[in-house]
Amino acid sequence: MIFAHDTEAALVSAAALVNTGGRDEEGLPNLIALDQFFRAHGWTGRREHDEAELRSVRALRPRLRRIWEVGEDEVVEIVNALLRESNALPQLVSHDGWPYHLHATPPDAPLATRMAVEAAMAFVDVVRTGELRRLRVCEYPNCGNVVVDLSKNRSKRFCEAGCGNRAAVSAYRARRAQS
């Protein structure tokens, strides 16, 4: 484990959220998709289950995506802004069978606020440990998805959308064509 469990979960969730704003189709087209995302990433707390909530979660994606695209100083600016705007107050909590971990918003805060702050708190750990190079963009041509590399040797190059398999098949075909 590179980071604490809650940090890794928040990083993976942030990347998954960013990747729902894909170039080809909307990954959160409706409230059902948001509900599925909420459950898949273990989110807890208040939900409005309305279009305004969906819009606010979608609006968070470009701000988070910038973190994968900029240098450390600008990452710090984005993270600090997310924490400041949400009046984040870090506290140790234990719930749903999880050991103590940090939350910086109350469980009744709006979902997009909780997502923003959880991501920001995770990025704090990434910056503090000098591990920003673990945040990458998928190397597969024309993909553009973001990647959180939690491998021990920082070797993850592709996103979770099958790009690694496509790259391996392309390399295999190229080798076969040369022989």
What residues fall within each predicted segment?
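Cysteine-rich micro-motifs
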Residues: R154-G164
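Glycine-rich loops and low-complexity Gly/Arg-rich segments
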Residues: V117, V127-T129, G162-G164, Y172-R173
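Small/flexible residues
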Residues: C138, F158-C159, R175-Q178
